[in-house]
């Protein structure tokens, strides 16, 4: 349970991958993870176009070869024909985790009505959790942290509060978050102080 956390970050964008503009998804994810996680982690990053076979290959590589515990994708989750990230994610999945997609849409609907058009999914492949996040940096943070009022009180929980316990259940790795950013939830019996008894 003291293994180094490995995270794969995949930005899916035709234009960013071809140099039309600079990718903002991976830097936003890295910055947020550095602020939110207590644990040291290692990152594998990929910037790729909206091509389903390439997305599938990338997800398999990050899980099967690099042994990433968590893979976060950004972009390609809408209804447009080139938005195939969820399709690729489902194609490589062993099991679907529908609660993640449902909660991401719930959070995003507090900010934009078009969130209902999102097809984001969460899946398990082997011992890894793969989550599709929005493409916009602001929406990435909102989805991970949730909806907060002006005083910082959480009104709607973000998806990352469930990620540490999910990783613990599927792989055995124990990670924690900084409560000032997001509070991770796990049952009392699964908390570090009770595991070490």
Please report, for each region that a protein language model flagged, where it lies by residue.
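Non-catalytic beta/alpha edge segments that cap or flank active sites
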Residues: 1-197
């Amino acid at each position: 349970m003291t293994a180094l956390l490995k995270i794969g970050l995949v930005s899916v964008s035709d234009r960013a991958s071809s140099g039309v503009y600079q990718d903002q998804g991976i830097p936003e994810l890295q910055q947020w993870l550095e602020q939110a996680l207590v644990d040291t982690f290692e990152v594998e990053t990929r910037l790729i176009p909206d091509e389903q076979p390439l997305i599938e290959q990338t997800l398999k590589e990050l899980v099967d070869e690099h042994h990433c515990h968590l893979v976060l994708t950004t972009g390609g989750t809408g209804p447009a024909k080139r938005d195939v990230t969820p399709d690729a994610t489902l194609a490589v999945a062993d099991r679907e985790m529908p609660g993640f997609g449902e909660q991401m849409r719930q959070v995003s609907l507090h900010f934009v009505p078009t969130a209902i058009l999102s097809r984001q999914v969460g899946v398990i492949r082997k011992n890894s959790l793969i989550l599709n996040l929005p493409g916009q940096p602001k929406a990435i943070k909102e989805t991970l942290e949730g909806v907060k009022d002006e005083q910082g009180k959480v009104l709607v929980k973000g998806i990352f509060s469930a990620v540490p316990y999910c990783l613990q259940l599927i792989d055995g790795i124990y990670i924690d978050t900084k409560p000032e950013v997001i509070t991770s939830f796990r049952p009392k019996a699964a908390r570090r102080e009770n595991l070490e008894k």
